Amino acid sequence: MVQLTQFFASLDWEMISRLLVAALLGGAVGFERERSGKVAGLRTHTLVSLGAALLSVISIKLFQVFPSVNGTVGYDYHLIANIVVGIGFIGAGTILRRDNRIEGTTTAASLWVVSAIGIASGFGFYQEAVATTVVVYVVLAGLWLVEKYLTRDIRYKGRGIFNELKNSEPHKDLSSEK
């Protein structure tokens, strides 16, 4: 029992709260995606935000243990850059082309933003993380109505980039030409 008490006493509750906040905020965005029936929903968004927060917390811990290497400081920034790159690959997996439509770009963008929310939470920037979550939720839950009515003519009358993609000439395989 003493060991368990010592274990809880040694926990870094500030860092744990950062992880919990990231999971909660990522879950809020994921809930909207889940409710909308999107490919990446509650669990995916929660895990992306939590993972980004964990890597941010690890970055802080690494900096505390290894403050500099050859007089260079900046572990924090390298990990953040790699989080963003990694999330780009996950997001790319949600983008699909169906018939003449490209789907999943909003979900890919929401995963990218959720990773930023996780990074902000991991570094303890709660105000920024919460404010961003609120704005993202409003964009996802409310702007689709505006988009639906403002872009109806563009979509259904064949104008815009999607029409350009649909009518563009497929790429030729230059390797087969002699």
Question: Where are the model-predicted features located?
Answer:
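Internal alpha-helical transmembrane segments of multi-pass membrane proteins
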Residues: V73-H78, N82, E103-G104
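Alpha-helical transmembrane segments of multi-pass membrane proteins
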Residues: G26-V29, A52-I60, G86-T94, V136-W144
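Hydrophobic alpha-helical segments embedded in the membrane of multi-pass proteins
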Residues: N82-G88, A109-V113
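Membrane-water interface at transmembrane helix exits
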Residues: R33-E34, I60-P67, G93, R97, ...
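Alpha-helical transmembrane segments and their membrane-interface boundaries
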Residues: M1-Y77, Y126, E164-K178
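C-terminal ends of transmembrane helices
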Residues: G27-V39, I90-E103
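Canonical alpha-helical transmembrane segment with a positive-inside/aromatic-interface signature
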Residues: Q127-K178
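Interfacial segments of multi-pass membrane proteins
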Residues: A108-F125
